């Protein structure tokens, strides 16, 4: 049952009894009044906390900040159009398909990667809004998603600036290597290209756990990797923060509307996971993370073995210094794996972790505008 939040005025106690506190004979009575009032306030605060904690975990869902329309509806995704004008090369943001909504690229006012491109010389922006997998989608493979990405590019005229984020990064790199003429410039941000580089958490998990463990997870989801499984795994990486500290912080800041709004904004995205097709997920674990086939030149994409050296277009590599999901080494390895001349490769390591690469305030207002302008200079 949802607990209704009390209005701020209901938190204001009536202290009229304190006018009598100067009378020694009434001190015990006044202390009793204060104890009762404090108990009532604490109880109301606790009820509000319970209601808000339930709300952020169960009642919120992802929202888009910037006006857009669906221009293509596929089994795997919606292709969303955020354009405010036209340009020679549209920008296609390939959002992560790793258990959370694509709204990370349009997270909140002032924290929108979409807006960063729109406001910095790229009026035509599209986003791959990957769909949560239904049971009917359980047998979809990597090829299914490559085919969808390829179709989206065709829908946009056959040539794009492709921006691959997180798990969308390796998919974008594979697409660019498979169809090099369709990608005129490439950005890889927080993207695991060489999955055996560095000391990331995912590298460790995929190294230490056998495929039977991953298959068991998919079996539990009736052929899918359920988003809730992934969410609990991510939370388990920082249990103190996720299960204790964030609730203490919420309790202490419950009367701060700005804090509550920020908490709800993040919860809309983080606490609303997507399911993945089991076949797709198991292929990613086996072929990309365990066998590192993309780097070895052994990865099959839509019937053809691909080589990252086929990528020769201007490429920007962005990594987070303290990213424990995709350490910088995994991203920057692309420098010597792709065929682009060094003079047309830019790279940057920014302070912070993984998620902040795509929605952190400083990155959105300083780093991504720089990338957008670099792309303009390279593709004009």
Identify the residue ranges that each predicted region occupies.
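Alpha/beta-hydrolase-fold enzymes
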Residues: 1-35, 157-158, 171-279
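Short, surface-exposed "cap/lid" segments of acyl-processing enzymes
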Residues: 56-58, 62-134
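Alpha/beta-hydrolase active-site loop
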Residues: 137-155
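Short beta-strand immediately N-terminal to the catalytic nucleophile in serine-hydrolase-like folds
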Residues: 162-164, 189, 318
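Gly/Ala-rich beta-loop-alpha elbow adjacent to hydrolase catalytic centers
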Residues: 163-172
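Short beta-strand/loop motif that positions the catalytic acidic residue
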Residues: 311, 317-319, 323
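Conserved alpha/beta-hydrolase "acid-adjacent" motif
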Residues: 324-330
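Catalytic histidine-centered segment of alpha/beta-hydrolase-like enzymes
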Residues: 347, 351-366
């Amino acid at each position: 049952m949802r607990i209704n939040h009390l209005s701020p005025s209901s938190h204001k106690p009536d202290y009229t009894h304190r006018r009598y506190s100067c009378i020694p004979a009434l001190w015990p009575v006044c202390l009793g009044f204060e104890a009762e009032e404090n108990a009532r306030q604490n109880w109301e605060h606790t009820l509000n906390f319970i209601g808000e904690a339930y709300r952020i975990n169960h009642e919120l869902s992802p929202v888009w900040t910037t006006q857009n329309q669906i221009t293509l509806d596929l089994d795997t995704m919606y292709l969303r159009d955020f354009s405010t004008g036209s340009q020679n090369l549209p920008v296609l943001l390939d959002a992560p398909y790793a258990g959370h909504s694509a709204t990370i690229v349009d997270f909140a006012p002032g924290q929108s990667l979409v807006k960063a491109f729109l406001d910095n010389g790229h009026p035509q922006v599209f986003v791959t809004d990957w769909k949560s997998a239904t049971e009917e989608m359980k047998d979809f493979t990597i090829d299914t998603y490559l085919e969808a990405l390829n179709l989206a590019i065709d829908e946009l005229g056959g040539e794009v600036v492709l921006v691959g984020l997180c798990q969308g990064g390796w998919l974008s790199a594979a697409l660019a290597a498979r169809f090099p003429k369709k990608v005129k410039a490439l950005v890889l941000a927080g993207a695991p290209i060489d999955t055996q580089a560095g000391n990331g958490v995912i590298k460790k998990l995929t190294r230490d756990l056998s495929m039977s463990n991953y298959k068991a997870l998919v079996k539990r989801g009736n052929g899918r990797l359920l988003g809730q499984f992934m969410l609990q795994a991510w939370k388990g990486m920082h249990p103190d923060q996720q299960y204790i500290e964030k609730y203490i912080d919420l309790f202490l800041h419950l009367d701060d509307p700005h804090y509550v709004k920020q908490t709800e904004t993040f919860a809309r995205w983080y606490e609303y996971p997507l399911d993945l097709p089991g076949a797709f997920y198991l292929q990613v674990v086996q072929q990309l993370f365990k066998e590192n086939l993309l780097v070895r030149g052994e990865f099959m994409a839509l019937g053809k073995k691909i080589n990252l050296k086929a990528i020769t277009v201007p490429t920007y590599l962005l990594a987070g210094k303290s990213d424990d999901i995709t350490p910088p080494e995994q991203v920057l390895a692309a420098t010597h794996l792709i065929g682009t001349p060094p003079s047309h490769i830019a790279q940057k390591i920014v302070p912070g972790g993984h998620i902040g690469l795509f929605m952190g305030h400083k990155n959105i207002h300083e780093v991504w505008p720089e990338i957008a302008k670099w792309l303009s200079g390279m593709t004009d």
